[in-house]
Amino acid sequence: IWPMYGREMKDHNWRKGGYGMLTLAQTLWYSSNIGVSRIIDDHYRNNPEKFVKGIYRTGLHDDLKIPLVGATPARIRMPHRNKNGQYDNWAKTSLPWMSIGYETQVPPISTLTFYNTIANNGKMMRPRFVSKVMKNGETIMEFPPEVMRQQIAKEKSIKELQTILEQEIGRASC
């Protein structure tokens, strides 16, 4: 349990004593709420707009244009300052809680698209469910691959994320 602005941040295993000190990679492997929220809060608490703009740059909030009823793009709130320089739509807990998925609305397909983008060396592809529609052996409609963003982050950052995710897969399968 970690106190944050009058609230308690917990990991799923808090009743068993939690994880203790973690590296960045371990924080991601274990999906530690405390670790992620502390890292993000430490680095962005004085400039939460920078954090949200960084998320926007990855395309996580992009409209995937999924042709299904009810499909909507992710909603990730940008903090706004009033004329006095105070945030009018933001609390001290907003950033740490947003960093672990609260205070946002991110459909699973957006999360999957993000992970696919990391696996695809940073190139974001529009999700598609079929490549073509055929009738009587004839192709009547095609859905070619569509690039949404050529590169969502620096190549070095993508490679580091790939390494962490590959290590997690290896760790989890042992």
Task: Describe the residue ranges of each PLM region.
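Beta-lactam-recognizing serine transpeptidase/beta-lactamase-like catalytic domain environment
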Residues: I1-S173
